[in-house]
Amino acid sequence: MAQRRKITAIVGLEQYNAGLWRKIKSMLDKDAELVQLSDVDLEKQNPEAATAIREADCVFMSMINFKEQIDWFKEQLDQAINEKTIFIFESMPEAMALTKVGSYQVTEGKSGMPDMVKKIAKMLVKGRDEDALYGYMKLMKIMRTILPLVPNKAKDFKNWLMVYSYWLQPTPENIVNMFRLILREYFDSNVKVEPIVDVPNMGLYHPDAKEYFKDVKSFKSWSKKRGVNFDKSQKMALLFFRKHLLQEKTYIDNTIRTLEKHGVNVFPAFVMGVEGHVLVRDWLMKEKIDLLVNMMGFGLVGGPAGSTKPGTAADARHEILTGLDVPYMVAQPLLVQDFESWHELGVSPMQVTFTYSIPEMDGATAPVILGALQDGKVETVQERLDRLAILSKKWMRLRATSNRDKRVALVVYDYPPGLGKKATAALLDVPTTLLRILERLKKEGYNVGTLPESPTKLFEMLDRATDYQIMQNKPEAIKVSREKYNELATYHERERIEERWQAFPGEIAPVGSEEVFLGGLRLGNIYIGVQPRLGVQGDPMRLIFDKANTPHHQYISFYRWISREFDAHALVHVGMHGSVEWMPGLQTGLTGECWPDALLGEVPHFYIYPVNNPSESTIAKRRGLATMVSHVVPPLARAGLYKELPALKDLLADYRERNQAQGEDVEQVQEAIMTKAELLNLTDDCPRRPDEPFSDFVSRLYIYIVELENRLISNSLHVFGEAGPLESQIITITETIKNRGENGRSLPYIFIDTSGRNGHYGSYEEISSLSRKGDEAAIQLREWAENACREFVKQTMFDRKNPMQVFESVTGGGRMPEEDKPFIQRIIQEGAMMIQALSDNSSEMNSLVKVLDGGYIPSGPGGDLVRDGMNVLPSGRNIHSIDPWRIPSETAFKRGTLIADGLISKHVAENDGQYPETIAEVIWGLDTIKTKGEAVAVVIRLMGAEPAYDAFGKISHYNLTPLDKLGRPRVDVLMQLSPIFRDAFGILMDQLDRLVKDAAKADEPHEMNFIKKHVDEALAEGMDFEAATSRQFTQAPGAYGTYVDDMIEDSAWENEGDLDDLFIRRNSSAYGGGRKGEKQSEILQKLLGSVDRVVHQVDSTEFGISDIDHYFSSSGSLQLAARRRNTKTSDIKLNYVESFTSDIKLDEADKSLRVEYRSKLLNPKWFEGMLKHGHSGAGEISNRVTYMLGWDAVTKSVDDWVYKKTAETYALDPEMRERLATLNPQAIKNIVGRMLEAHGRGMWKADQSMIEELQEIYADLEDRLEGMADDD
């Protein structure tokens, strides 16, 4: 009797197919023992899986693409005692290389197909690179017909190909016969092998049809007999996997039937996965479909297999989806998660990658999760299917409705209310933007009524129409009655809301006891509304987004009124950002119980968003179902000098040029310098050190003033669709070009080197670093190089002069080096492209019009304009994030290494040679995307590790660097993550967690491994290993924000203990590895007690640390928490790293803040630029004053002179005060109020006379505001 063979099949992403494999096992039971494993078994390194692999006679593997899993699999093979036959398909090269079929093996790094086969496959698709994988599939069928002609010496390759052919037709019967073929050919089993039963590689399907349709024509003909004429109606296409159709098609049938029940005509199309784009391009393009829904996830081009060449997929998808020009959605069930996991945690990191991250690069929008696993089978949720159907109908309605009949809702913000923030958004002039949008819509044929003559008038109209105090009893005001409210909200929703906010209408905007006020401005078919506040001002604990929280009655009424009463065809949120997408619910994979989905799931949603924030835009896309329309950031400018600063700079320059004022007047000049420096409070910024020569002090003070003068600032706001001034474009492009480099040579360094000025400097970064330290030669060289770069950019790119001649001119006769010519030519080309994109910004408004027509706008990466250049241009695209598997990038790791080494060197120099034991680092999702992972690289380097790459170029894990190579101890790192990082980078968190655990397990002494030291201490105190190795903390799942900023803005705190307690409560959820946000307050506070330094990166020029509240509420609060728990010292330094320009700056928070206040808040160039934007600009000034108080609350780092100068600039100057009161009375009231609050809390020691004057001004402003309300 023949030996019973053991076959182990390992198939990735196959958890949904338990029923299929049970059937296959049963059918094969007489022939062999079959064990079926999944990628999860490899990931968890299950002992049962190890045994099955070692004991198998044959191993069959497919869809395994993680190096760690392959490495473990190979370990099991190496421990086996028997020879194995190994078939591996559709997996990473490291896996494919393990194939062993008789004498046939796959060469490492190859895909398994001989080169000749690849060439033939490419011929079959007419040389299209993007169709190469599809060509292989076509070739497979052709080759099967000629296999009998293959000579016996190629028998093993023939068998390998035949086995793959069976696998590509994955019915249970074909899979059983595949295994029987293996048994017959390699184990002499006497089994009968049936021929392959073929199914078309792609086609159309309907659950009511008896057979598959091999083309569109036959499907349309069949449909016509059923009364559906696809040529005379709107229709959508549904793409799904052929494999699922053959094996587990219930969810496909349910989706098709639900769509048809809602009256949607569907082209249900199946593909193997690699040829989805082929079907769209060759079959659907000519059918003029109105919507494309991809149920497969992954990329449209190449599917799970990706593309054959870098850039090929991007080019092909752009061509196809732009040509198709319809909305593109992804909707699919969870194939690797059960319902319990989904409803508790949202979508797993693995599924996030192919459901969200990859499709977003194609421009996919409005993702809907349709179901999950139950007992090894995909089960759909009817409510989710209905959501897909409703959205599909609304998208198609948007396309079908004429512009004159379309109703569009434009939503702006006012948070927190009462502070002059109505109709403001980050970086955007909202009133002017609104008017420009209305003017363009009018040209496009929309009914916009009678437009106001100016942005100011439009704001006045909107302000009055949304003012609760003025309008609540006006008959023309928009309100919702109790009866209507009961129609708009379901009984279950009302029950949840009433438990939180009491009975309708609640305490927010009630009109009597039977109505709630919405307000808003109607202009023809356009509605402009102000998003309701989150909760009750002054009580931030009511605002916390825990899972039990809900929107209040006015909030749900507002969005339901827009979607159902106003019956909007489209909803547009204007600017970054509102609150609705941050409402309670799952992080991803939202259900109808999640408030963002409940509020936004009934109307096509568009979001005008700055191109520099792809991380927060991801929340709007994934939770808010939004299509992003990006806009550029405001123009950049140099801060310049003002008031007495230019005179001091001249005095310092004169001192330096006269060789340190040698002669009789030396003491007088020195006294004049010190007097002016003290008058300007510059001795706080740049104090003279003990025993420091005066000439050295002058050099440091001079370079500090030059830094202030040349600091990049945004001193205006962007108007959607408009271009910035020429000078700003020159500055932006110059900074971008300076960031570029090749072979260690940047443009500034090439100029210096070619001009003969280099001397002993090895790089421009070295020159910049030395100049900041006061090195006289480096100062002069840096100034010369900066001017040379600017002139080169202006003359070659803007004036279009000959680059060779300009190069010679700026270098004083130097010739452009031959080896640098290709690099210089490339940056000139990039600069020219940037000029085109920045000078003609019409793409923004054109894209908005396009999406309102129901069309497709291209996707594009978001990021920093200076750092990324043309990569983020043109604006007006549907911005997306980055590939989490390639973080940090090689460049980011190099720069992160420099930052980490600089931090350690700085600490050692300041602490008598002692290394830091723990550094707390804030890591934001936005920073990670913009810098491609510099902050992550800092963590890796501090811990003494480096990335390990697989054959695809993905980072599989981080390897510990040997201590003898590292040359210092491993530093422990407490990572304070943003919730967006938590949502977007689950894979990265797992990799960082493994690094911590590897370091904790390393056989190294405590004095050389502080991670191990701290973990061992925690274990000795009774913590388990998971708790002891927790290093990544942020808010609980589904929660966003520390709320320290809200507590400060609402003045709802008494002392720093209140702020600290809130920070700890909100930020003690641990992540990474198996952690899913469990509270780990004990280890967090223990780690905080060991923190020696806090570090945070500033990722771009648009937002400095004084410009937004996130900095003080995260890294500022983190420093506060460390300071209150560290028993060794309270002097915990907070460092900010600026790496967005060509050199890296590392400064303490107090210095960074002084630079910010001097270059912006107190700088006429900045505030006059803001005031040109009227109401919005005044609101921006007011925000900065609130944030200043926030900084002082958590760090005590705002000097009295800053408060005094702020009061003198804005409140005590009658002319300025009146300007602000005219533009935005609530803004100036907030400015004065914050001054008084700072004094009242003891933060600002001011003269009593100044306080009394401010009190009088505040009372007068209050009276004026009350009088304005009374006038109405």
From Swiss-Prot:
Pathway: Porphyrin-containing compound metabolism; bacteriochlorophyll biosynthesis (light-independent). It is an enzyme of class 6 (ligase). Keywords: ATP-binding, Bacteriochlorophyll biosynthesis, Chlorophyll biosynthesis, Ligase, Nucleotide-binding, Photosynthesis. Belongs to the Mg-chelatase subunit H family. It comes from Chlorobaculum parvum (strain DSM 263 / NCIMB 8327). Transmembrane segments: none annotated. The gene is bchH. Involved in bacteriochlorophyll pigment biosynthesis; introduces a magnesium ion into protoporphyrin IX to yield Mg-protoroporphyrin IX. This is Magnesium-chelatase subunit H. It holds the Pfam family CobN-Mg_chel. It comes from the Bacteria. It catalyses: protoporphyrin IX + Mg(2+) + ATP + H2O = Mg-protoporphyrin IX + ADP + phosphate + 3 H(+). GO terms for molecular function: ATP binding; magnesium chelatase activity.
